[in-house]
């Protein structure tokens, strides 16, 4: 007898409060506030998170969380994971939009036998990250997988 899998819907709620000029605060229940500003290129303050930073970070963090969920499910032992991300913001058709988010994950494992598994799991994470699946920007992955010596 086949068991039918059911899927839930989820809701995410945030609140933004304007503070001054091009600066505000993002709030969510039971989480620390995040100060935000326009980027300096758009007359905002340097050194403060921007919506652009958060957009690219959302894709990056979702890919991490999806990768780790699949890795744990498949019994892959990950020594470390770090990923640099770049978002390409372009002026097209009279407006700015992110056309691409590039991810450069660096994953370290204990065994050479796990290198291909990591690449397969990264592809699965890439295909199933719900943030990436919700945006029109292309998301590319350029992974580097290393085996740690001496463990």
Identify the residue ranges that each predicted region occupies.
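Extended beta-strand/beta-hairpin segments
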Residues: 1-57, 68-151
């Amino acid at each position: 007898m086949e068991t039918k899998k059911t899927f839930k819907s989820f809701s995410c709620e945030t609140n933004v409060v304007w503070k001054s000029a091009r600066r505000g605060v993002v709030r969510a229940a039971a989480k620390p506030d995040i100060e935000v500003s326009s980027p300096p290129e758009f007359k905002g303050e340097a050194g403060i998170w921007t919506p652009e930073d958060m957009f690219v970070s959302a894709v990056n963090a979702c890919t991490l969380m999806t990768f780790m969920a699949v890795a744990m499910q498949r019994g892959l032992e990950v020594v470390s994971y770090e990923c640099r991300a770049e978002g390409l913001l372009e002026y097209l058709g009279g407006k700015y939009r992110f056309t691409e988010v590039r991810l450069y994950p660096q994953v370290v494992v204990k065994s050479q036998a796990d290198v291909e598994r990591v690449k397969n799991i990264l592809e699965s994470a890439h295909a199933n990250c719900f943030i990436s699946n919700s945006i029109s920007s292309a998301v590319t992955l350029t992974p580097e997988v290393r085996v740690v010596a001496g463990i």
